[in-house]
């Protein structure tokens, strides 16, 4: 599956959870999402592209919203058109050439890469409605440069979106004590989903 095929499945999963909120004992208006790397990218995609329910849908699950209310993620790609620096194309080429299949057939030409890269890069869809976002990122990450997180957070600030960047000095694409960051994630979710005081 490529990115454009996966995203609808994430919309569906969130709608399914919201539809079954009572069954699962969750508050449907307080859903958070997390992930790392590609999963972090999908988490941010849902933060900026969550959709309202389709009132006229035959399937009741599709009548639910796919919007989420909070994100905490690790080292996510946020802008495939400006990857490690302005103008660096990584839509299945360059740094991400080994992941070309994830971008599908539209990654074959420079023209299509520009279109696709914009469509799938969360940074272009940040708005004042974007929920709170926390990103943990290693500053020695070569696969997903920290530039990705830094630029995304700048965009969040431009729109007044609550955001926090946790920089792990000297760390690459993952590190040994990530469980400590998961605790920070839990505190972030507690603050923005449960209304508990910030730690």
Roles of regions detected by a PLM:
Residues 1-22, 183:
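Alpha/beta-hydrolase active-site loop
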Residues 28-30, 66-70, 130-133, 159-164:
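Loop/turn elements at helix/coil->beta-strand transitions in domains of secreted/extracellular proteins
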Residues 47-49, 82-125, 131, 158:
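Mobile cap/lid helix-loop segments that gate and shape the active-site cleft of serine hydrolases
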Residues 142-151:
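Conserved alpha/beta-hydrolase "acid-adjacent" motif
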Residues 168-175:
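Histidine-bearing beta->alpha loop at or near hydrolase active sites
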Residues 180-199:
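Catalytic active-site module of serine/aspartate enzymes centered on a nucleophile-bearing elbow/loop
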């Amino acid at each position: 599956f490529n990115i454009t095929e996966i995203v609808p499945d994430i919309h569906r999963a969130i709608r399914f959870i919201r539809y079954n909120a009572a069954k699962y004992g969750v508050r449907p208006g307080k859903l958070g999402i997390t992930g790392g790397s590609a999963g972090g990218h999908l988490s941010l995609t849902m933060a900026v592209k969550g959709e309202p329910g389709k009132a006229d849908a035959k399937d009741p699950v599709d009548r639910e919203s796919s919007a989420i209310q909070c994100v905490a993620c690790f080292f996510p790609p946020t802008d495939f058109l400006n990857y490690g620096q302005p103008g660096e194309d990584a839509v299945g080429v360059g740094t991400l050439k080994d992941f070309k299949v994830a971008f599908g057939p539209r990654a074959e030409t420079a023209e299509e890469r520009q279109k696709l890269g914009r469509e799938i890069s969360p940074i272009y869809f940040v708005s004042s409605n974007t929920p709170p976002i926390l990103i943990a990122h290693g500053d020695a990450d070569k696969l997903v440069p920290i530039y990705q997180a830094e630029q995304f957070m700048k965009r969040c600030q431009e729109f007044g979106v609550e955001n926090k960047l946790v920089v792990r000095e000297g760390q690459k694409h993952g590190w040994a004590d990530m469980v400590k960051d998961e605790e920070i994630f839990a505190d972030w979710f507690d603050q923005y989903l449960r209304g508990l005081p910030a730690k």
